[in-house]
């Protein structure tokens, strides 16, 4: 399989973690390398609905939209519940994890200087309301969101909490259950190895970059 996405810690991260957890081989490719173009806008027209990530399963089959890809992989990694009601609840929680993308992923992955400070200030303000329903689930069901078993929604929630913990851990000081959740999640098969080998993240708030094979590349939607 081939996973196509930007140089960015966002929608593709939970997908990568699921594939590592399920021991599913894949190749991660930037869109400009996969499509042979200089920037994302040059290849956007060739992508279903013009969005990434996409998962190339074989020469004839491509999936798009992160939620669809996650649900497809959940059936291969035993991270989708069998009970239909619980399955619907897991779907709903996964959909709500997308509320973290702009305040967390974009703030630390793309914003710089004054804009970064403004976005971080806003994140600090809205975070309690964003986290509360997830935290309630951890208190009711822990160590994961619905039980002692991780479902695919846990992978998405972990991604955002891990990024927040690494970039502004003080914002989670009042949420010990999230620390417990992250520590338990990192014990899942394949997760620790993935975290040790994924690109390192530097320059937060100034010049964000991700390290690939010793070379640090700016985050974003273009070749640099």
Q: Where are these predicted regions, by residue range?
A:
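GST superfamily/GST-like fold recognition
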Residues: 90, 145-187, 195
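Alpha-helical recognition domains of nuclear gene-regulatory proteins
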Residues: 18, 72, 133, 137, ...
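Residue-level recognition of oxygen-bearing side chains
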Residues: 68, 177, 190
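Hydrophobic/aromatic-lined pockets within catalytic cores
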Residues: 74, 78, 98, 139, ...
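Alpha-helical packing segments of well-folded alpha/beta enzyme cores
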Residues: 15, 126-130, 134, 160, ...
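GST-like domain detector, emphasizing the conserved glutathione-binding G-site
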Residues: 1-129, 140, 219-224
